[in-house]
Amino acid sequence: LFKDVFDAKFYSQLCSDFPDDMKFERHDYDKENNLKQKKFILNENNIFFKEIINKKESLKKIYNFLCDQKFKEDIFDLLEKNSIRLQKHNTQGVLRKILNKIKNIKNFGFEFSMISTDGGFIRPHTDGSNKLISFVIPIVENKSIENVPNSGTNILKSTEDRYKYNFLNSTVPFESTEIVRKIPFNGNQIFFFIKTHNSLHSVGPMKNLDGETFMRKSINFFIYK
């Protein structure tokens, strides 16, 4: 968890430039468990994505910075200094790059996310097996969101043996988990975690304050294998 990451003026602009609700696609149905998560996303699969990124200078800057190979190398160097060594997959020749392009294999993922505070949640999961590292940048325009119960990210451990090795990212019932650490949803911070068989985490379920509904907005970024 890193605090006060951005220049205050840039972070304020980043919050202002966050895409409007109409551009988002509903991604709120958990088919496996027949539950509505009240989640909305906007990512590279949206036909408006590139246009949205390029129209706003702050979004363009953060996108280009995160998706640059140097950022990936810096993160790997930081992890290595802390005795965490991951396979870098960064020595790609021209042929490999062409094949990846043809197969639509991506090195990075970038998305805008919104979750309603009116009961919204993300069930406990470990992230897809194609991911190496996930980053979350909270977008906090209204400080009230920081006081919404369960608006942060909970780092969990499974209380049942059948969920303890979960590399393939099966969702886990909330009642089969125990909170190890709570990461608050505060402005101008970034936190990241490494995908493992037990990198279990969740959001919510959230509850409105004084009957007022907010959207928990974030920029999520992924480094893929």
PLM segments and residue spans:
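Catalytic core of non-heme Fe(II) oxygenases with the double-stranded beta-helix
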Residues: 63-225
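Non-heme Fe(II)/2-oxoglutarate
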Residues: 1-84
